Amino acid sequence: MADDSLSPLDDVGIQNQRKDPDVSTDSGLTPPSSSASRAIDFLTLCRSLKTTKRTGWINNGIKGPESIADHMYRMGLMSLIVGDLPAVDRERCIKMAIVHDIAEAIVGDIAPSDGISKEEKSRREEAALEEMCKVLGEGTRSEEIKELWREYEDNSSKEANLVKDFDKVEMILQALEYEKEQGKVLDSFFQSTASKFQTDVGKAWAAEVNARRTSSTQNK
């Protein structure tokens, strides 16, 4: 849902078309390393995560809605501040939180209202992730990003269970904040996540958000 006429990959492609200038040793400058070039291309591609607004909020008429990156950042903070849990790698949770929606830099924020199946959504995102990792270059970092994304997508570890819960907690917390700030009623976000939390932490944090919502409603 980026506003630019060129896709993020188009932009990176244009950048990659230029040839590295010949820099003489007399100038005192050295040409940028290929790894630095790939890193900056990848980060440029990720820029749209900061500018693409989350579809669910747009569809509900929220003014100035959060971006995809906003959402992932607070999930990262959730993973940072959560207490130690048995057999859960908190550092892995932080990494997973900041990459779980990274493919949306290309495909955008696909919401249920778009009428796209979960299988097709996953296929598009995986293809986008492969393209992004090609930009970054094959190596340990690309493999780590793909592994983290797949683990989250498959919900195949305790870390993925927790981060998926944080995805929902962050959403309902944001919904509560928008209800307070903009006078909205955003029941659908709370209804769609009810009884879907997998971890004790997720259930406890969601219960706290819901309790605050109930209290806020009663005090009006």
List the predicted regions and their residue ranges:
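Alpha-helical, largely C-terminal catalytic domains
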Residues: 1-220
